[in-house]
């Protein structure tokens, strides 16, 4: 049987707040090291 690939991208989080995005990533991948970077337009 094929190995289950760990989730590594969250395109659905575009437009969310950093807090919302971080919470969702940690739900999907509890061992993730989530780093929030500032974005300047």
UniProtKB/Swiss-Prot annotation:
UniProt record, GO biological process: response to wounding
Cited Pfam families: potato_inhibit
GO molecular function, one term: serine-type endopeptidase inhibitor activity
InterPro entries, per the entry: Prot_inh_pot1 (IPR000864), Prot_inh_pot1_sf (IPR036354)
Keywords: Protease inhibitor, Serine protease inhibitor
Described purpose of this protein according to its UniProt entry: Inhibits chymotrypsin.
Family per similarity comment: Belongs to the protease inhibitor I13 (potato type I serine protease inhibitor) family.
Record-given protein name: Chymotrypsin inhibitor
